[in-house]
Amino acid sequence: MLMLDGGSTAILPKLPESISESRLWTSEALVRYPEIVVKHHEEFLKVCDIISTFTYQLDASIYDEKVEGVPLKQVYANSIGLPVYAREHLGLPNKYIALCLGSHAATIPGCMEYKMIYDKPTDFEMLYNFHKNRIEAIQASNPKAFEKIDFIAFESLPHVTEAEVVCQLIQDMKGWSKRCWITCTCPERSTIERVSSIISKILSINHDSIWGIGVNCFHLSLLEPIAKMLSSLLPSNITAILYPDGRGLYQNPDGTFSPGSTDHPAPSPEEWSTITAKYSNLHNGNLILGGCCETNYNHLSLLREKTK
């Protein structure tokens, strides 16, 4: 089992001002507070096997250089250069870095990757060019740092067409000589069947090119059924990927609960790590296990202790 970090939202409480209004979301920290981003990476490197870049929503389509005051090429260069620097600064060559790339839907305001809303959800060519152009721009911005990236993580894919696009791109580019994984969104229990169908489609296309498959940013209450679903679908040579979030639940009018608020309190780091650690041997340990939104160093350090 390899342990992933808690994602980029853990940086938000550490910033001197809010960046929640930025379309770049946590990628805005690369623009305004690169020194805090380095400290964020260094903190997680102390307990995790893999750290992830702040590039989830970073894309030319939503980046305004006049507003940000920093050339996008420089921000792209820092996005991979800062984690590489953090790893080398701490002298931890056996730790890994994942280039984190969100869905095209993540560039549409309103967390649309969780609502499966795109401008053109079945436009294969548009989605292909979106992902291809972004990776090429990141690579060109800092070729030396890109060489030192270990994984490429295509995250929060909510639609089967985009999953097909990513599979084709990975095959065409021979994975950029990286290990590539794909994760889907699963915001509700009712969406597990959709996720299962997307994963089945990925496996039917070209799973030889895909290193790992799983689900990211889902509520802890969905961990058990999602883990069972992955166990039933994934062949032994594909790494299972699971990173649940640390959020609470809100109560719907019908009395059911859904991810997104604190009407039902979020699990404590102790509770989150205890539940998550139970799945550390899933898929015979061929697994990446970590955190997502609203998990932090405390969650992951406790998970490390419980999975030693």
From Swiss-Prot:
Record GO terms (molecular function): S-adenosylmethionine-homocysteine S-methyltransferase activity; zinc ion binding
GO cellular component terms, semicolon-separated: cytoplasm; nucleus
Methyltransferase listed as a keyword: yes
Keyword Methyltransferase carried by entry: yes
Signal peptide feature range: none
UniProt keywords, alphabetically: Methyltransferase, Transferase
Single GO biological process annotation from the record: cysteine metabolic process
Family matches, as SUPFAM superfamilies: Homocysteine S-methyltransferase
Family annotation (PROSITE patterns): HCY
Hcy-binding domain residues: 1-307
Source organism, top-level taxon: Eukaryota
Pfam families reported for this sequence: S-methyl_trans
This protein's name: Uncharacterized protein C57A7.07c
Organism: Schizosaccharomyces pombe (strain 972 / ATCC 24843) (Fission yeast)
